[in-house]
């Protein structure tokens, strides 16, 4: 059974999804390419302990503070995507890393000389639990604020909320509808 709930954030409404193990999805409902991707029609709206934890986490986060805990998460995906998600959860509040840095971490773990930053980008881009699994903290090697499921302007807003110096980043001059 899939459960859903909503949260109204300063950046727009957020859809929460989960199963009996924990939170499986968190998406902005407007302007997001992946909102509810894979949710079944029989998903049931309800309250759960992990939705309560998630709403508490989001409330602290949107007040500009590091929540200091994670709600109960259930990462659903391939081993590679889940490992990328775990690494993203280790990126400190107010810090950023590059796709290449994550690729280097995975290459070291697997005893490889190199790992594709593009493969990491694909995994980051399919992160179903935005904000909490902080894909917004992953940037291009040249400082570009590359794709974000909730839109580049939301990615920028989240990084600003965390106190990042935005002068170090480049924002695309052409922002399409999917990036707003």
Question: What does each model-identified segment do?
Answer:
Residues 1-24:
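DNA-contacting interfaces and partner/effector-binding or oligomerization modules
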Residues 3-10, 56, 65-177:
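Nucleic acid-binding interface residues in structured DNA/RNA-binding domains
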Residues 20-70:
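Compact structured core domains
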Residues 15-16, 25, 98, 147:
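A sequence-level detector of short linear motifs
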């Amino acid at each position: 059974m899939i459960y859903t709930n909503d949260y109204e954030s300063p950046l727009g409404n957020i859809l929460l999804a989960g199963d009996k193990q924990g939170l499986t999805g968190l998406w902005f409902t407007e302007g997001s390419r992946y909102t509810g991707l894979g949710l079944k029609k029989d998903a049931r709206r309800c309250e759960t302990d992990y939705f309560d934890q998630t709403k508490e986490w989001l409330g602290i986060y949107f007040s500009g503070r590091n929540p200091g805990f994670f709600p109960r998460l259930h990462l659903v995906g391939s081993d590679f995507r889940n490992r990328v998600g775990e690494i993203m959860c280790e990126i400190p509040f107010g810090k950023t890393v590059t796709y290449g840095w994550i690729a280097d971490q995975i290459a070291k773990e697997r005893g490889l000389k190199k790992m594709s930053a593009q493969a990491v980008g694909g995994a980051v881009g399919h992160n179903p639990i935005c904000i909490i699994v902080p894909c917004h903290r992953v940037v291009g090697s040249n400082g570009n604020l590359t794709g974000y499921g909730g839109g580049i302007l939301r990615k920028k807003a989240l990084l600003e909320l965390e106190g990042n110096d935005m002068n170090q980043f480049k924002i695309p001059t052409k922002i399409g509808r999917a990036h707003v």
